[in-house]
A protein has these predicted regions:
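Flexible, surface-exposed loop/linker segments and immediately adjacent secondary-structure boundaries
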Residues: 3-42, 46-138, 142-301
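Beta-propeller domains
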Residues: 296-314
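Short intrinsically disordered, low-complexity coil segments enriched in acidic
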Residues: 1-3, 314
Length: 314
């Protein structure tokens, strides 16, 4: 491994963006095998023997962090045993939310009860579980609501992993973490954000191949483009944007169209989003919530969203 383009975290460089944004990952012994859509393979020898494992980078800055690699592999164990033997087939699903709307070809990948990753079509009303990987194809999009009312939406040709979630209203604890590999996305915090109001602490994190977004009681739009660069448009709350390794922080705390775009792995701040940035976001984001969806901020009983959508379609 060599030094990262971002800092001294060890890094191995990928041939091109097809391996970064569209590669299929497989653990073969201690090796990590990445296959791009054309069927070309790239082997990271002894990846699982590194401590820490290297970032898998492009020379322009974006990369796959060890956490993202683990999430893409859907391994039901943590980083502390990532170099261990085969995954335990006893996988307990932990519900984190549900799909409120799915239009077009939307699929989910998750670890099945036999220890193998399964791919399923997604429809309105389906439950979502910790570790689920959502994929939208073509012009498809999907809207999800977590148990606390947090909303997370994905636009066309997008890929994201619901890597971590917890919510205990009685204990006033919770967190939401997601990896977005490509595509447009929208986030709006629910009860977790309200519980953390006034605290100097992030309650949610969105990670991409080029940025990490720390969130406090916020609403935002974002997009990961075909080169792995990330654009964020601030709508509300307090956002801290860093590079892949958590360095070079930039704060977005101005309500309005403040935006950030990452280039060569280092965040840059723009007080006002450019017309080009706005156009790119709007092209890749899912449709905004309807007035009925906006009224339902804190979640509801199962079935309510489905009934609303059916009424809209009739």
């Amino acid at each position: 491994a060599v030094e990262s383009a971002v800092n001294d975290h060890p890094a191995i460089y990928l041939p091109d963006t097809s391996f970064l944004l569209e590669g299929q990952l497989e653990k073969v012994g201690f090796d990590l095998v990445i296959t791009n859509p054309e069927g070309v393979t790239f082997v990271v020898a002894d990846y699982f023997s590194y401590s820490p494992p290297p970032n898998l980078m492009l020379s322009s800055g974006p990369g796959l962090s060890p956490g993202l690699v683990m999430a893409k592999l859907h391994l039901p164990f943590g980083d502390d045993v990532m170099f261990a033997g085969p995954a335990n087939s006893a996988n307990v699903l932990e519900e984190v939310g549900k799909v409120t709307l799915a239009i077009g070809k939307v699929t989910v990948k998750r670890m099945g009860p036999d220890g193998q990753v399964e791919e399923l079509d997604v429809k309105r009303g389906d439950k979502l579980y910790k570790g689920d990987e959502l994929v939208t194809e073509g012009g498809a999009f999907v809207k999800a609501r977590m148990l606390d009312g947090t909303r997370f939406h994905l636009g066309k040709n997008a890929n994201a992993i619901l890597s971590d979630y917890s919510f205990d209203e009685t204990a006033k604890t919770g967190n939401f973490e997601v990896y977005v590999i490509r595509g447009g996305f929208h986030y709006k915090s629910g009860k977790i954000g309200k519980m953390f109001a006034g605290l100097n602490k992030n309650h949610s994190t969105i990670s991409t191949p080029s940025a990490t977004i720390g969130i406090r009681g916020s609403e935002l739009d974002g997009n990961v483009d075909e080169f792995g660069s990330t654009t964020i448009r601030h709508t509300d709350g307090y956002l801290t944007i860093t590079d892949l390794n958590g360095d070079n922080p930039v704060v977005l705390d101005t309500i309005g169209n403040t935006s950030i775009i990452t280039f060569n792995g280092v965040p840059a701040k723009f007080e006002v989003a450019s017309p080009e940035q706005i156009e790119t976001l709007n092209q890749n984001l899912p449709p905004p919530d309807t007035p009925e969806e906006l009224l339902d901020e804190d979640g509801d009983e199962p079935g309510t969203d489905e009934e609303k959508v059916v009424e809209e379609e009739d």
